[in-house]
Swiss-Prot record:
GO biological process entries: translation
Gene Ontology MF annotations: structural constituent of ribosome
SUPFAM superfamilies linked to this entry: Ribosomal protein S16
Protein name: Small ribosomal subunit protein bS16
Domain of life: Bacteria
One Pfam family here: Ribosomal_S16
Lineage of origin: Bacteria, Bacillati, Actinomycetota, Rubrobacteria, Rubrobacterales
Gene: rpsP
One Gene Ontology cellular component: cytoplasm
InterPro entries reported in the protein's UniProt record: Ribosomal_bS16, Ribosomal_bS16_CS, Ribosomal_bS16_dom_sf
PROSITE patterns: RIBOSOMAL_S16
Organism annotation: Rubrobacter xylanophilus (strain DSM 9941 / JCM 11954 / NBRC 16129 / PRD-1)
Keyword check for Ribonucleoprotein: yes
Family: Belongs to the bacterial ribosomal protein bS16 family.
Length: 85
C-alpha cells in the first residue's frame, strides 16, 4: 500500500481550509485517511500552518511520501530540512 502525506480540503465554497493527512494514495482527496498530522489555513495573513512534528517524522520514517505542496509546508514549519544540491 502506497501511503501519501497530502492535503484534504475542508471549509465552505471559496473559503478553503486544509487538513494535512496520511492516506492511501488510491483513496479520494477528501476520503478516508489513516492519520491527521496537522492543518493549513491559507486565508490567514500570514498563512497558518500547524503540524504535529513527531507524527509527521514518524510517518516519513515509515516511508510515507509527501506531496509537493505538503513537502513545502513541512519545510516552512521546520519538520523537513532543506536539501542542498
Amino acid at each position: 500500500m502506497a501511503v501519501k502525506i497530502r492535503l484534504a480540503r475542508h471549509g465552505a465554497k471559496g473559503k478553503p481550509f486544509y487538513r494535512i493527512v496520511v492516506a492511501d494514495a488510491r483513496s479520494p482527496r477528501d476520503g478516508k485517511f489513516i492519520d491527521r498530522v496537522g492543518t493549513y489555513d491559507p486565508r490567514k495573513e500570514p498563512s497558518e500552518i500547524k503540524v504535529d512534528a513527531e507524527k509527521a517524522r514518524e510517518w516519513l520514517r515509515k516511508g510515507a511520501q509527501p506531496t509537493d505542496q505538503v513537502r513545502n509546508l513541512l519545510r516552512i514549519s521546520g519538520v523537513l530540512e532543506e536539501q542542498k544540491g
